[in-house]
């Protein structure tokens, strides 16, 4: 691929990232992305054989952004010897991303619209989950738990359940349902309750 082709391909992804941020997932048509990039309607097909492949490239940017934010915040937000505090930071970054980057967040987890093997999307998204698994494992070890909890679940399963809980909080908070149900305007207590539910109450 020539330098010009590489530049145009990146431009199409850049436009998609900008578009989903401003107008949401529903705005990401090939035609609209091409129009805003200043190319013909058929030009994106030269670099992305399907609409899904272009959406996957856009979603990859989202995972890269979220991973960078989480890594930086976890490193700065809590001592390594306190993985529970780091999990709290991780959860806040995740929920903040879902709130401030709603369109991108929705795209990232719409696997019916994405091709996981396309353009390294799987390789970009999985490290974030591995970070969560590592933090969960260390938090359980730090609290004196064995490699298995009372339910027989491994850290990877506990992390999966916690992720599902965080995702549910993010979605319901974004829709306004949790604010209505709880009467609260701070997601922090919900995050702490989720951590306690999956890891047990904090002991220190």
Descriptions of predicted regions:
Residues 1-7, 203-204:
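N-terminal intrinsically disordered/low-complexity leader segments
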């Amino acid at each position: 691929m020539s330098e010009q082709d590489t530049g145009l391909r990146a431009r199409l992804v850049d436009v998609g990232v900008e578009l989903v941020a401003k107008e949401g997932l529903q705005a990401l048509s090939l035609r609209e992305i091409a129009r805003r990039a200043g190319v013909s309607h058929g030009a994106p097909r030269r670099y992305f054989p399907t609409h899904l492949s272009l959406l996957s490239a856009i979603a990859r940017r989202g995972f890269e952004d979220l991973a960078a934010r989480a890594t930086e915040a976890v490193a700065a937000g809590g001592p390594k010897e306190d993985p529970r505090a780091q999990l709290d930071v991780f959860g806040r970054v995740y929920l903040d991303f879902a709130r401030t980057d709603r369109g991108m967040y929705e795209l990232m987890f719409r696997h019916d619209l994405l091709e996981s093997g396309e353009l390294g999307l799987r390789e970009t998204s999985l490290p974030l989950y591995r970070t969560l698994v590592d933090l969960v494992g260390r938090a359980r070890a730090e609290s004196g738990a064995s490699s298995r909890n009372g339910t027989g679940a491994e850290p990877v399963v506990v992390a999966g359940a916690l992720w599902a809980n965080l995702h549910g909080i993010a979605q319901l908070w974004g829709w306004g349902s949790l604010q209505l149900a709880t009467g609260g305007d701070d997601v922090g207590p919900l995050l702490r309750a989720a951590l306690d539910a999956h890891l047990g109450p904090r002991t220190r």
